[in-house]
Amino acid sequence: MNGGVGAEAATLYPTFGGFAVPRSGEPEMEKHATIDAYIGALPEPLRETAEAARRVVHRRLEGATSAIKWSHPVWSLGTAPVCYLKAASEHVRLGFWRGASIDDPSGRLETSGQVTAHTKLRSVEDVDEELFADWLRQARELTLGG
């Protein structure tokens, strides 16, 4: 027995555009060293959507560093994570570590626990630069204590 590697793993975990899809139905992204590689491995329209969201974060979260952490793109201020992109089979999540505290009159942020929140981006049309800029401004203030 090879521990589920090879043909047996392919039967248990069919692939979907660079993802392995376990029984839970949520794809597991292959490990990528860079954000470019992560986004580049996504199928369309997720690739275009993730790239559009990434451009907004880069423009609107000044001074942030970005890297692959926890197997997906994460933007941090200093050592504190602020936001992330995480691909699923039919959408890309733009999430915020302190997102549950973000004022969101649009109702698009979904809380995921007591602290975090995310929005699901199904297409590039879901990327709203002005709305996301406001969320990123609030996330910066929450992260830096301002």
Per-range role (PLM):
Residues 2-146:
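Charge-dense, helix-prone N-terminal extensions
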